[in-house]
Amino acid sequence: MRVSGVLRLLALIFAIVTTWMFIRSYMSFSMKTIRLPRWLAASPTKEIQVKKYKCGLIKPCPANYFAFKICSGAANVVGPTMCFEDRMIMSPVKNNVGRGLNIALVNGTTGAVLGQKAFDMYSGDVMHLVKFLKEIPGGALVLVASYDDPGTKMNDESRKLFSDLGSSYAKQLGFRDSWVFIGAKDLRGKSPFEQFLKNSPDTNKYEGWPELLEMEGCMPPKPF
């Protein structure tokens, strides 16, 4: 091998060794020396979580008060829901709601659920509703939510029974109106827990139906 070839080989080896030493000495790093920018090193931003209380309320009810939330049905598509003291009494998921009037009875002192039933007010027999309303026990709270059509089969007797429970709108209830209500047996005066929307082409949110109603809050035992 010529001397020039040997020199080239030595030069190449020297360059490789020198480069390797340079990399090792100056470009090596450890994780301890890495400093991330503050915006990268900062711990992830915590999601803001809104604490919810019984029946999804954003504020807790006072001691000895009952939490409730009632939603009417949306058109003839989504059924109503009734929650009382964090118990879902009626809902589409429980498969115990129906077209017309959905009614739950609750003990006004203990909050215990006494029963629930749906009444078809479009093609059903209104006398089933009348019988049910007449048999409501004393001291019971009456929770009502409409779905689709709550008013077609209503008669004077059923309207009076609801009025006696504290309703201000039972006498006006008609075809496809939206209505949510909490009343009580032997109530003196009118209930403060009631919402009503008339079915009107000028104000309806859905085609042929008014907007669903949502009523929530807290009530004391024997609130009326």
From Swiss-Prot:
| Disulfide bond positions | C55-C83, C61-C218
- Keyword field: Disulfide bond, Glycoprotein, Lectin, Secreted, Signal
The signal peptide here is 1-25
Give the sugar-modified residues: N107
Q: Which PROSITE patterns match?
A: GG_LECTIN
**Domain GG-type lectin: residue ranges:** 64-222
- CDD domains according to UniProt: ILEI_FAM3C
**UniProt tissue specificity:** Abundantly expressed in placenta and weakly expressed in small intestine.
Question: In terms of domain of life, where is this protein from?
Answer: Eukaryota
GO biological process terms, alphabetically, are: aorta development; negative regulation of insulin secretion; neutrophil homeostasis; neutrophil migration; positive regulation of macrophage antigen processing and presentation
Recorded GO MF terms: carbohydrate binding; cytokine activity
Report the subcellular localization: Secreted
GO CC list: extracellular region; extracellular space
Family label: Belongs to the FAM3 family.
Protein's recorded name: Protein FAM3D
Provenance organism: Homo sapiens (Human)
Gene giving rise to this polypeptide: FAM3D
